[in-house]
Structures are given as structure tokens and as C-alpha cells.
Amino acid sequence: MGVKIGINQIKKDMFIVHDGQPYRVLDYDHVKPGKGQAFVRVKAKNMKTGNVIEITYKSSESIELADFEQRQMSYSYFDGDSYWFIDMNTGDMIAVPASVLGDEAQFLKEGMEVFIFLDKGQPIGVELPKSAVYEVIETEPGFKGDTATSTLKPAKIDTGATVQVPLFINEGDKIKIDTRTGKYIERVNE
């Protein structure tokens, strides 16, 4: 049984238990209607199935925090079915099924340090750094003076993922991407 907290203490990226299943809080909203009791609406991702649901709690309720083992590891390689990570302290390797990573897999780079969440030794989640730097390997050429517009174009980055970038970004440029949303943050001069 995990630790219980008041629902008003909930934060983004917390791990909670709902109906006996582990969930990660993606977003939450404290709602105070004109009439009636205040409540908290929580958007959460099931760590085992990947399904995203919305849960409503009364503001007086408490929730159970999920009790997971968290290990910092480094991404090594993909074997076609699983992503392999190495524990930098022990040298242990862990295989994480592609279904556990979902869309985040497109932003994995060799050597990237991540957190792996384990439930009774089984990987149930991976947390990438909030942002990372990637090289643009394919995009339409930019033009001088294209900096004042908010128009975006597709660009393929070195992991193979396609992201939307401003018009002034060229092949070979290094860009910072938000790994949670896939959105362009800024051009990086290294």
C-alpha cells in the first residue's frame, strides 16, 4: 500500500494508483463551481496500457501514490522489439518493450540518460529529459529574412522523427526539441 496524500497536493508527473492500476498525472485542474463542492479533474496515463483517462476527485478525497522503483539509465540500442538501456552504475541491461515507450521513442538518442520506472522488476515507464538537442538532417532550404514569420515547415531530425520548425532552420542546424510534445524550442549554436 502506497502513501496517501490529499488530492489538493497533486502535481504533474506524479504517479498515483486509481482502481488498482498505476497512472502518471499528465495534467490536473482545480475546479471551484459557483454552487456545490470544489473538485479536481485529473488527466492521467495508465502506465501498463498507455491509455489516457480523465478522473474527477472531490477536493476532500485522498489518493494513493504509486510505489515504483526509479533507475537512471542510458539508452543503448533498439533490437526491433525492445529498447535496451544500461545502468551506468551496475552495468545491468534492461529491455523496455516498444509499447511502454510509445511516441517518446522517436526522440531517443544513443547515450541519452533517462529514468526507467519499474513495478516489481517490470519496466512500466520511461521518462526522457524534458528537452534535447537534435541535428536537422533533412528540410527545405531556408531563406535570409525568414525570421519574422511564425510559419513552420517539416524537418527530419537525426533520430528519424519529423518535427515542425521555423522557416529559417536549415539542414545541419542543431535544434532543441521538447521531448514531451515534439515541439521546436530554439536553434542551438554549438
UniProtKB/Swiss-Prot annotation:
One of its GO terms (biological process) is peptide biosynthetic process. Pathway: Protein biosynthesis; polypeptide chain elongation. SUPFAM superfamilies: Nucleic acid-binding proteins, Translation proteins SH3-like domain. Gene3D superfamilies: 2.30.30.30, Nucleic acid-binding proteins. One of its GO terms (molecular function) is translation elongation factor activity. The keyword Mitochondrion does not apply. Keywords: Cytoplasm, Elongation factor, Protein biosynthesis. Pfam families: EFP (PF01132), EFP_N (PF08207), Elong-fact-P_C (PF09285). It is found in: Cytoplasm. GO terms for cellular component: cytoplasm. Involved in peptide bond synthesis. Stimulates efficient translation and peptide-bond synthesis on native or reconstituted 70S ribosomes in vitro. Probably functions indirectly by altering the affinity of the ribosome for aminoacyl-tRNA, thus increasing their reactivity as acceptors for peptidyl transferase. PANTHER family: ELONGATION FACTOR P, ELONGATION FACTOR P (EF-P) FAMILY PROTEIN. Belongs to the elongation factor P family. This is Elongation factor P. It comes from Persephonella marina (strain DSM 14350 / EX-H1). The lineage of its organism: Bacteria, Pseudomonadati, Aquificota, Aquificia, Aquificales.
